[in-house]
């Protein structure tokens, strides 16, 4: 019951579900990770959204009572247990429609990629996820554009918040995991 256009990965859910159905019906020899990659390919090439792998991967590789910590650069991942201790996760539908094809997602991603190209001219950086906040602050001047710098900063800082949230989950600390998500910009 995922509302279409709600920002809850409805298209990725349909892509992965379709893959599961076809695999099971026809007996295809493909892994869940393969199905995630096929879903991403479909989104990129047929829906026109230059999305990453995160949504499809989380759906295809999800594990009950766990979060997935995914390195999208090489698809390595670990599971982080979620012990809610009586707390509840609530997802509310605002009824505000959202579609990545109509959003600024492709533009934002392109801006992050351009910022990375500029930084790579002066420093070997594979991707924004490879940097700490301090490392970003040292090299951000190479970007040379305020908007591109903001986009890159968001990518780096968001990745660091994710790392901190995973550490909190691994320590059964769900309260420490909340502030990083709440500070996302």
Task: Give the positions of each predicted feature.
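C-terminal nucleotide
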Residues: 66-185
